[in-house]
């Protein structure tokens, strides 16, 4: 029997660690959290809680028969104020029994959860459930919390002798043999170092996680019911989620309010007597900066300079360096993965998690390819620096290696104990692992590898030339820049599109443009001069990358939570994506407006950022967690009471001050139905006037242009129609053309253009394109509708029936929930192979039986991952949020209030 037990969060991580520890250790997984707040109640001891009504008939009496006094209301002076009530997560009894069984036979138990607040909290809860000597773990949690298992409720209803599914039947262990170990990378050296210095649970880290959880729970569970009452059920608010929505909504308001200003630029093509001709731009007038506001001014300047003598006024040459970027932090990884690979933050973090926990590399087995991916530090270990400095001269030449390592400064509140996101072994190049990784994993690993190697290379060097040319009273300027040494750019190229570049990747004016040799005083010939009209542009809408950047710069939330925050506001239909940029839906704007008006201080950017700083202070042991929550509560409860009385209701109708167009007597009220927002008469039902507020085709896009949607198939305009499931876009060519497009909350789903592929159609020879249909993406002929060739896009997972085809996502005309098409997964060789499954396949092997893939499916108790193989009972519940970052709290909708 193994002498020591090691517990981690996931089977993949357990598999990777197990091969490094040897036979003296058994490594098992807790499958994420084992304890959490209850799903259907707030689960926190709050100051306004009323005494619970006692069950049973008559008064509760003491031993001598005297009547017991009712429990006193909870006040802010209560010693256990804001205490969370933790439950064992439903279905975890089997996991806990298994861990207890192994722990009882081990001489030591090591909790090896991730090295952050969430990992520390998981470890603290594991220590509790392993060591508390009660059958159903009605237990004292870390720092005085009380944890009460949902299983206890089941036990009270169970018949005598009947086995309870989640009963904790294995005895607890001695808490003295429980230790905590942490490591930033899953490598033999890092693991050995961690086990040489085990420690106890860090209560400061646990307190910081607990404080964040309590704050998020208070906001979600207290404000969300307000939205149910005032707007509609199922909506949610979140401490950080709502601030992110506010940023997007306020940016949209800026765009609408933006007034375009005309301005002109003037460009001259000049001949210096030797090639090439070069361009100069109007720069100054009589030595002062100049603005050209209109065509009249531009024409006057043109008339003056056409008659002027063009002469070189000055020539300046200098060498300019572009320094390499630092290795990735979490947020920078999310930004770069979106800009370069178009990966969402959620997708990036899911892929990075797999690279961190371990992937199969043939005979090597499971290998962790990157360090821990949730970090705000750019620190790199000395061993990693030595290794990359060995690689650079061997692979690229000694001219690319700086004399000493490049060191980068992390932001002030970064955890220097963590490292940047980097390869665990930089000598394991992307080419070495290419055959073992799918495209998505490979591209992300390649990006991380390239960024890390580039960070330790020499700067790129450019020869920059600036020529000022006089033309009478006016000065024109030409700038050219030619790369002299590529440096780190040998490895880490700039994205082709300027819009996809980070702030420190912006090209200088004239980069890549050569200028002829000229001397001061040299006369030039004017070859051509042209004016160009421009208009100022409104601030751009946020992309995932720029939203993450804004949140980080404002100190809102933490990079580890950005993926879940962005996913939530999209899933709640508060925002939609239009060509990769976030636009608030009508619902999102209304919700943001209500919350910001009633809770302006709670959802203020600076206030939210200050709360994040306080969480850091709790982690450092500088601030008691209850004090931070109490200060928030005292401000919040005042706003909550005021909002309960004063927040306007879209259910009741919000007066617009406009008379009804039909009866002329009633006032138009803005209201909401299941189809979206509309205007209705206050005299309803006597007057049934209704006006849909869904944006129409003539809606202003915010940049002065009118949006008109055209049919993909016939080219005719699309019109908004209403059907049994709400509004949608339909072709005006109906019935000859029956094309439709879905709308969300009255706003159109962005049209996604066809993406050309480097492939020819087997029927007609035209190019193939990736198309977007009602059932998802597919490949079709660019010659449509003349050629109707199509084929599905495969998922890279072999069909288990024929072992030749691959899974594809399909849809049928039959309806799923809420009128949606029914989605299923089948073999790409259909009709030769008719295998189908309603469950989504996932390219991960079963940790129990080794089956080549698992599936995600919905059960009565929630979504689970399970083995597809008949006879294998492996199953893993999918928590509502990633184990490392809980989604912000919102109550589960229950029966409507009477």
Predicted regions and their residues:
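Basic, low-complexity terminal or inter-domain segments flanking catalytic cores
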Residues: 2-5, 15-16, 25, 132, ...
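Alpha-helical scaffold elements adjacent to nucleotide-binding pockets in ATP/GTP-utilizing enzyme cores
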Residues: 16-20, 98, 102, 121-129, ...
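C-terminal or mid-to-C-terminal helical accessory/interaction module adjacent to the motor/catalytic core
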Residues: 186-268
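Short helix-coil junctions and helix-kink-helix linkers
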Residues: 332-344, 548-558
């Amino acid at each position: 029997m193994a002498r020591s037990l090691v517990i981690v969060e996931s089977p993949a991580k357990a598999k990777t660690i197990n091969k490094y520890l040897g036979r003296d250790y058994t490594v098992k997984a807790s499958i994420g959290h084992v304890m959490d707040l209850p799903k259907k109640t707030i689960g926190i001891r709050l100051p306004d809680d009323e005494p619970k009504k006692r069950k049973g008939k008559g008064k509760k009496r003491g031993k001598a028969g005297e009547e017991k006094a009712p429990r006193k209301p909870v006040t802010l002076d209560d010693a256990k104020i804001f205490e969370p009530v933790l439950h064992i997560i439903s279905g975890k009894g089997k996991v806990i029994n298994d861990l207890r069984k192994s722990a009882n036979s081990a001489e030591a138990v090591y909790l090896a959860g991730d090295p952050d607040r969430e990992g520390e909290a998981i470890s603290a809860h594991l220590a509790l459930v392993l060591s508390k000597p009660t059958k159903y773990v009605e237990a004292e949690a870390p720092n005085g919390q009380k944890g009460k298992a949902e299983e206890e409720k089941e036990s009270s209803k169970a018949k005598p002798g009947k086995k309870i599914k989640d009963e904790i039947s294995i005895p607890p262990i001695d808490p003295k043999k429980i230790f905590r170990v942490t490591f930033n990378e899953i490598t033999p050296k890092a693991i050995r170092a961690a086990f040489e210095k085990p420690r106890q649970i860090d209560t400061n880290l646990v307190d910081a996680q607990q404080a964040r959880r309590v704050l998020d729970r208070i906001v979600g569970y207290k404000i969300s019911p307000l939205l149910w009452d005032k707007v509609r059920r199922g909506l949610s608010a979140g401490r950080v989620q709502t601030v992110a929505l506010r940023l997007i909504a306020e940016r949209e308001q800026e765009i609408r309010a933006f007034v375009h200003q005309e301005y002109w630029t003037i460009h001259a093509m000049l001949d210096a007597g030797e090639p090439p001709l070069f361009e100069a731009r109007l720069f100054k007038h009589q030595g002062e900066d100049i603005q050209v506001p209109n065509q009249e001014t531009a024409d006057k300047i043109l008339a003056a300079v056409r008659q002027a003598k063009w002469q070189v006024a000055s020539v300046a040459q200098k060498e300019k360096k572009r320094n390499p970027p630092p290795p990735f932090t979490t947020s920078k990884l999310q930004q770069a993965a979106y800009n370069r690979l178009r990966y969402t933050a959620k997708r990036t973090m899911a892929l990075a998690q797999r690279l961190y926990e371990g992937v199969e590399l043939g005979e090597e087995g499971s290998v962790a390819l990157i360090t821990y991916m949730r970090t705000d530090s750019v620190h790199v270990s000395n061993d990693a620096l030595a290794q990359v400095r060995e690689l650079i001269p061997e692979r690229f030449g000694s001219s690319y290696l700086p004399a000493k390592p490049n060191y980068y400064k992390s932001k002030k509140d970064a955890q220097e104990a963590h490292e940047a996101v980097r390869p665990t072994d930089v000598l394991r190049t992307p080419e070495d692992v290419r055959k073992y990784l799918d495209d998505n994993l490979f591209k992300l690993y390649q990006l991380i590898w390239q960024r890390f190697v580039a960070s330790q290379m020499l700067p790129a060097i450019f020869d920059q030339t600036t020529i000022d040319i006089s033309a009478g009273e006016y000065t024109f300027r030409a700038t050219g820049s030619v790369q002299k040494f590529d440096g780190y750019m040998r490895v880490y190229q700039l994205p082709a599109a300027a819009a996809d570049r980070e702030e420190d990747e912006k090209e200088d004016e004239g980069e890549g443009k050569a200028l002829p040799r000229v001397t001061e005083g040299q006369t030039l010939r004017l070859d051509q001069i042209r004016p160009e009209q421009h208009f100022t542009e409104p601030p751009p809408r946020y992309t995932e990358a720029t939203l993450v950047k804004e949140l980080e710069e404002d100190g809102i939330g933490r990079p580890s939570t950005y993926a879940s925050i962005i996913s939530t506001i999209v899933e709640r239909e508060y925002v939609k994506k239009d060509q990769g940029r976030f636009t608030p839906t009508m619902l999102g704007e209304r919700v943001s407006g209500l919350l910001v008006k009633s809770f302006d201080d709670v959802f203020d950017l600076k206030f939210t950022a200050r709360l994040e700083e306080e969480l850091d202070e709790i982690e450092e042991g500088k601030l008691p967690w209850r004090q931070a929550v109490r200060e928030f509560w005292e401000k919040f409860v005042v706003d909550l009471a005021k909002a309960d009385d004063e927040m306007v209701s879209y259910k009741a109708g919000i007066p617009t001050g406009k008379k009804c167009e039909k009866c002329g007597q009633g006032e138009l009220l803005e209201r909401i139905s299941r189809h979206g927002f509309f205007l209705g008469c206050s005299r309803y039902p006597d007057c049934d006037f209704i006006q849909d507020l869904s944006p129409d085709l003539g809606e202003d896009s915010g940049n002065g242009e009118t949006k008109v949607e055209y049919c993909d198939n016939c080219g005719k305009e699309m019109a908004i129609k209403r059907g049994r499931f709400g509004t949608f876009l339909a072709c005006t060519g109906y019935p000859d053309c029956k094309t439709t497009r879905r709308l969300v909350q009255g706003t159109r789903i962005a049209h996604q253009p066809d993406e050309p592929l480097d492939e020819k159609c087997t029927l007609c020879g035209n190019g193939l394109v990736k198309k977007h249909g009602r059932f998802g993406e597919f490949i079709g002929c660019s010659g449509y509708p003349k050629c109707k060739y199509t084929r599905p896009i495969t998922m890279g997972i072999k069909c288990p029936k024929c072992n030749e085809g691959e899974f594809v996502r399909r849809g049928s005309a039959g309806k799923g929930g809420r009128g949606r098409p029914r989605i299923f997964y089948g073999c790409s060789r259909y009709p030769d192979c008719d295998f189908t499954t309603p469950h989504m396949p996932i390219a991960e092997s079963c940790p129990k039986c080794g089956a080549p893939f698992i599936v995600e499916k919905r059960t009565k108790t929630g979504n689970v991952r399970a083995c597809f193989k008949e006879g294998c009972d492996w199953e893993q519940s999918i928590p509502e949020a990633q184990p490392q970052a809980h989604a912000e709290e919102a109550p589960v909708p229950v029966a409507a209030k009477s």
